[in-house]
């Protein structure tokens, strides 16, 4: 069995985690600003991209109804050797209606055994979970039935709670544990994880985990909600974070793929926020105790992002396909009928120091309409790794005069002056791609600065129509640019450099090449 767990990752393919369960695990609709999330909805943000989460959990389903409605058949037909199936039922098996009810120790256990055995027959790896706790700080005889109610929070309906969390699941918690022991299956005690969390937070603070929504603040539940079963975004993210650590312990083969980020941005509702700017706003000002990590899940985020000076030490990490884009350009009119200007056209502005970005695409999609900046970097000690900068004229604006920037294995494309500005910047092992004739760089290095632009081990490439490209022209008289051990494509003119029509610039600039090919 242990060998099976680890062999799942020997093949060069993505491993899928299939999830089956009820509403506490399920993905939720996002209409009306719905704040409800199952913990499975957000689980993908805690794994690297070697792991794909496919959540089939459904609201209101028990182990019985999940089988009877054909939902299990859909899942098991998709399972391939080495895939995982996460199994969590209980809340609705407790219901009295015959379409859902099962008995612990008999029919409930039998259904769990079926899930396990059929998963193994397909070469998959089952993992059993018991039910998350209900937030029940009172002797509530209707706690089980209230799962389905999602009660409005109207006057006089607020529950009176005690101080001790009271169990509502009974023997249904033991069935997954017993079947796991019987069949040698990994078991995650989610009830204990969530019970300890809710009890530790207490009756008032624990409401922050569940769907306790004031009246009139959410279009999805305009009358508010008093719900002690279903999780909100914060609750789902908190509980998934605790659970994934337990998963790593019980299923060691998954441990290397577990990731924790302070915030997650996702278009599909699987994160804390839908936009990158919301995540930036959430970062504490001048946080000095450590870096704030933000995962941007796959998706196209059309927005203008500003990272102000107070949001220091942010790490912005993208999944493959995480694209930040906008289409402003210098001559475009703003709301006052004025031209936006080159600086005003940028998709992203970085003013804070110690910014780090990895695997993010910064794009200005305006096209060939003149100056249109994808990324404007002013903060000191900015580090970009494996990022892409897409645009045409003025793609990357290295703006800060005292800013030091490092571009590591990045891709930067454009036409005219598509890397430009005052900053000191090192480009290492980057691909610099020309989309047409023009100039790769236009530095405006201040007089007295020791360095301007340094390119080391970079590859300069171009489209077929790019035939006449200069390495640089000086935006200011003391411009500096050096290319070392770079691969200069045939599109680079032998003369290399352009003086921007000013012969006197040749007396003050510092342009150099060393051992390029």
Regions found by a protein language model. Give the residues of each.
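Bacterial N-terminal signal peptides
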Residues: 1-7
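Serine-esterase "nucleophile elbow" of acetyl-processing enzymes
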Residues: 10-57, 73-85
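Alpha-helical cap/lid subdomain in secreted, periplasmic
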Residues: 12, 71-237, 241-255
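N-terminal module-boundary/linker segments of secreted carbohydrate-active enzymes
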Residues: 13-26, 30-31, 258-272, 282
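Structural motif
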Residues: 16, 83-84, 125, 293, ...
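Active-site-proximal beta-strand/loop segments in catalytic clefts of secreted hydrolases
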Residues: 20-24, 55-61, 87-92, 129-133, ...
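Acidic/histidine-rich helix-loop elements
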Residues: 27-37, 57-66, 95, 99-103
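Sequence-level preference for short, compositionally simple segments enriched
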Residues: 261-517
């Amino acid at each position: 069995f242990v060998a099976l767990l680890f062999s799942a990752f020997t093949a060069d393919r993505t491993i899928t985690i299939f999830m089956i369960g009820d509403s506490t695990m399920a993905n939720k609709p996002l209409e009306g600003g719905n704040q409800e999330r199952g913990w499975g909805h957000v689980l993908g943000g805690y794994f690297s991209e070697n792991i794909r989460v496919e959540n089939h959990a459904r609201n209101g389903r028990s182990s019985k109804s999940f089988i009877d409605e054909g939902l299990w058949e859909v899942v098991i037909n998709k399972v391939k050797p080495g895939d995982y199936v996460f199994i969590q039922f209980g809340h609705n098996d407790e219901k009295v209606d015959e379409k859902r009810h099962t008995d612990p120790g008999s029919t409930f256990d039998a259904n769990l055994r079926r899930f396990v055995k059929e998963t193994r027959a397909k070469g998959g790896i089952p993992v059993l979970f018991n039910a998350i706790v209900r937030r029940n700080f009172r002797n509530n005889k209707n706690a089980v039935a209230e799962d389905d109610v999602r009660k409005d929070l109207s006057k006089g309906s607020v529950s009176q709670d005690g101080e001790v969390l009271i169990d509502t699941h009974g023997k249904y918690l033991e069935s997954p544990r017993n079947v796991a022991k019987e069949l040698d299956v990994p078991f995650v005690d989610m009830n204990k994880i969530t019970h300890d969390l809710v009890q530790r937070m207490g009756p008032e603070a624990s409401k922050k985990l569940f769907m306790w929504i004031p009246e009139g603040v959410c279009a999805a539940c305009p009358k508010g909600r008093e719900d002690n079963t279903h999780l909100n975004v914060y609750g789902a993210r908190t509980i998934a974070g605790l659970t994934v650590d337990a998963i790593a312990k019980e299923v060691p083969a998954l441990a290397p793929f577990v990731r924790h980020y302070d915030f997650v941005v996702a278009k599909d509702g699987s994160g804390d926020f839908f936009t990158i700017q919301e995540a930036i706003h959430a970062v504490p000002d001048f946080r000095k105790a450590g870096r704030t990590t933000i995962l941007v899940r796959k998706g196209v985020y059309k927005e203008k992002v500003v990272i102000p000076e107070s949001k220091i030490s942010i790490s912005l990490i993208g999944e493959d396909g995480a694209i930040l884009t906008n289409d402003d350009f210098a001559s475009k009119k703003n709301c006052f009928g004025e031209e936006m200007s080159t600086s005003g056209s940028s998709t992203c502005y970085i003013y804070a120091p110690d910014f780090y970005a990895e695997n993010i695409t910064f794009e200005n999609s305006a096209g060939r309409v003149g100056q249109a900046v994808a990324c404007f970097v002013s903060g000191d000690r900015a580090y970009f790794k494996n990022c892409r900068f897409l645009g045409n004229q003025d793609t990357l604006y290295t703006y800060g005069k005292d800013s030091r920037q490092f571009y590591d294995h990045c891709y930067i494309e454009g036409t005219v002056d598509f890397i430009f500005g005052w900053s000191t910047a090192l480009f290492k092992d980057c691909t610099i791609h020309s989309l047409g004739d023009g100039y790769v760089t236009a530095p405006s290095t201040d007089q007295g600065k020791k360095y301007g632009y340094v390119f080391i081990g970079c590859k300069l490439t171009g489209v077929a129509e790019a035939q006449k490209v200069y390495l640089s022209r000086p935006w200011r008289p003391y411009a500096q640019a050096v290319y070392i051990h770079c691969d200069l494509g045939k599109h680079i003119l032998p003369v290399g450099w352009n003086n921007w029509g000013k012969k006197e610039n040749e007396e003050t600039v510092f342009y150099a090449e060393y051992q390029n090919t």
